[in-house]
Every structure is written in C-alpha cells, then in structure tokens.
Amino acid sequence: MSHPLETVVNETAANPEWAVIWLHGLGADGHDFAPIVPELLRPHWPAIRFVFPHAPVQPITINNGVPMRAWYDILGMDFRLRADKDGVAASVQALGALVDAEIARGIPAERILLAGFSQGGAVILSAALRWTRPIAGLIALSTYLPDLQAAADARVADGIRPPVFMAHGQHDPVIPLAVAVDTAGVLKTLGFPIQWHAYPMAHAVCAEELQALGDWLDARLAAA
C-alpha cells in the first residue's frame, strides 16, 4: 500500500479544529459512512473534518479470491488466524499517513479521532497498540482485534491509551459478540478506557448506537 489512499472528505464548517478518520468495512468504500455525519453532529460542536478513505482493491481468500476493497486479506474463519498480518500492518501504516496529513494541515494528534467499522475497526485498534501518538479517541464499531494474543502481550506506550467507544450487534453473524467482548476485555486489561454498548442487531449500525456515539463524541470534544 505504497500509494496515498483516495478519500471522501466532509468538513462540517470552515477551518476545522478536529478531524475524524473513518475506515469502512470489507467490500464497502469511503462513501459508506459519509451519510451519517449529519446524524452525529450537535449544534455547539467545533468544525470537524471527517475523512473517509477508500481501501485498496485486493483478492480476498475467504471469498474465493474475488477482488474487493479491503484493508487486509481474510485467510479463513478462525478469528485467531484469519487476518493477513502484513496487510494489517500496511493498513496501519497508511492510516498513519492520513494522520500525518491532518497534522500537517494544523490539527494536532490530540484532536484527531480514529473510527472504523468491522475490518476498519480492526485496523484502528491495531494502530492504537503500535503507535505512540496521543490520539483523542477510538470508535470501534462491530469489530475485533485481529491478533488477540499478540494484543494481550502488547506493551502500550506509557500514557498512550485513548478512550474507546465500542459497539456491537448481539446477533452479529460476521463477528460474533463474544469475539468483540474478548477484544474489549484485552483493551481494558491494557488500560484503555472502554465505553461498551451492545444492541439487538446484526452486523450493522443502529440509531441508538449513533445517539450514544454522539454523546461520547460530545464528551471528547468538551474535554479538550
């Protein structure tokens, strides 16, 4: 993933003071979550730049090699082994380049939030375990840590434990709820503050979830 990622950008007002970089799930693209921005916004919030990158197109092993947009290859059904580690690492690096671009525009890391759904969430959580950047927070929707054992053994940089909003469907057939619960447990053990939500839905996003996420974002923006 040596080329810069193409992105969809939505600025809520001129001169953004904050940025949210939001990664989509397998087979989707950067347009997938762009429509929810108006559902999250509160009138008193500062200007925010939402950045929705497109993942590169690549063959996906579990889907018989059919090419689609993906942050990494999925090798099988076993959640302990399914993620292509090199692909995850490459996407973490590409995400870092997006963060650097926002910093270059004048938004400090302390005012940048990372969000991701499914595969996208797996990438932002993996990044949080590797980076020493003081990111403002993580939004992990219907997702998991690709290498849970490695995460459990991780040594997170001192003080670099941003707050995490996690939400998951109780009837998710793609990423079972138990896998997400295990991920939340490991993150808590590592010292990440977790706000956890579970909803009676499948592999999706619901209105109640967006309301809770808006409340969480409100607290993050007010704390700065």
Cite the ranges covered by each PLM segment.
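Short alpha-helix in the alpha/beta-hydrolase fold that links the catalytic acid
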Residues: 33-38, 152, 176-186
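C-terminal catalytic histidine-bearing segment of alpha/beta-hydrolase fold enzymes
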Residues: 178-224
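Alpha/beta-hydrolase-fold catalytic nucleophile elbow
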Residues: 53-54, 115, 139-142, 167, ...
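Short, proline-enriched alpha-helix->beta-strand connector loops that line the catalytic pocket
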Residues: 159-164, 190-193
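Short beta-strand/loop motif that positions the catalytic acidic residue
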Residues: 166-168, 172
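Serine-hydrolase catalytic machinery in alpha/beta-hydrolase-like enzymes
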Residues: 2-113
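Primarily recognizes the serine-hydrolase "nucleophile elbow" in alpha/beta-hydrolase
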Residues: 103, 108-159
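Short helix-capping segments at alpha-helix termini
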Residues: 41-46, 106, 131-134, 188-192, ...
